[in-house]
Amino acid sequence: MVRPVFDAAVLSGRSDIPSQFIWPEGESPTPDAAEELHVPLINIGGMLSGDAAAAAEVTRLVGEACERHGFFQVVNHGIDAELLADAHRCVDNFFTMPLPEKQRALRRPGESCGYASSFTGRFASKLPWKETLSFRSCPSDPALVVDYIVATLGEDHRRLGEVYARYCSEMSRLSLEIMEVLGESLGVGRAHYRRFFEGNDSIMRLNYYPPCQRPLETLGTGPHCDPTSLTILHQDNVGGLQVHTEGRWRSIRPRADAFVVNIGDTFMALSNGRYKSCLHRAVVNSRVPRKSLAFFLCPEMDKVVAPPGTLVDASNPRAYPDFTWRSLLDFTQKHYRADMKTLEVFSSWIVQQQQGQLALQPAMT
């Protein structure tokens, strides 16, 4: 089968799109999925200001949301509005470049960073109608983002790298503050998860969803749960994010002053299954492009992911085996297309690997 080249400048105006982009009936979007999902609006500044009543209310709201579907929104977050505007302008500047220029940062097979046009190199069917640019961000290496952008796209794009270096720094700060809230809501204290993620090795992703002339037969991003720990998403003013809860798809309306936050598989494991990594997707429309900024908080690559002992007892045994973020990332890049069962399948895979190693040990001695 010939793999299609996803060039938004060509395909966004066509109705005769390649069949690889058509999703099966039952998986494609329906018009009735526009019902809004009302998620808690969390005043993170109030939580951290020392106001005990505000902190208690935030802790309660976050706990309820995370046990139900794992989504909430954060306001009063301290992110400068001009930085947000710059970050969105840079999305426009990058994705409106000619395809050959974007492909200078082309994502290589088996890697999680780089430019991807609909993941045509990874998958043969049910392709997402989108382009992405992904790169790593680590607090321990402040130059990492700029160095990557300049090395792949050239010196002319240094400012783009500088904007996202600042943005990632702010996202790391905000994510650690959210970790304090999550720790408090789980009863393990504010410091536990904050310490775990202080040396994070995270992923920043720019998403661009071009218009599609067959929006009810395609998806910008297919149904999946994020394998990472925490996702902090800023949407433009074009809706498209949908969450599957209570047996149906529901939309989260964009708010310019808010970030959408959701629990990922790795944090679900860190909470011993208490907090949910929920199924979600992105839909497209036939009129205008949609853009979003996604920061995926991840642990350091070889840090062992395991819940605190206080969340494990006879009534709540271990839900998942120990693993490292490196092993889960490799699994999703090389062995398994992330979906709603990623953590379950990965856990079984780990157990099989461990059993295989144990079976080999007697023969090796």
UniProtKB/Swiss-Prot annotation:
Residues 199-299 form the Fe2OG dioxygenase domain. Expressed in nodes and the ear of the elongating stem. It is an enzyme of class 1 (oxidoreductase). Fe cation binds at residues 224, 226, 280. GO terms for molecular function: gibberellin 20-oxidase activity; metal ion binding. Signal peptide: none annotated. Its EC number is 1.14.11.-. The active site is at residue 290. Keywords: Iron, Metal-binding, Oxidoreductase. SUPFAM superfamilies: Clavaminate synthase-like. Pfam families: 2OG-FeII_Oxy (PF03171), DIOX_N (PF14226). One of its GO terms (biological process) is gibberellin biosynthetic process. Transmembrane segments: none annotated. The keyword Iron applies. The keyword Transmembrane does not apply. Its cofactor is Fe cation; L-ascorbate. It catalyses: gibberellin A12 + 2 2-oxoglutarate + 3 O2 + H(+) = gibberellin A9 + 2 succinate + 3 CO2 + 2 H2O; gibberellin A53 + 2 2-oxoglutarate + 3 O2 + H(+) = gibberellin A20 + 2 succinate + 3 CO2 + 2 H2O. It comes from the Eukaryota. Belongs to the iron/ascorbate-dependent oxidoreductase family. GA20OX subfamily. This is Gibberellin 20 oxidase 1-A. It comes from Triticum aestivum (Wheat). The lineage of its organism: Eukaryota, Viridiplantae, Streptophyta, Embryophyta, Tracheophyta.
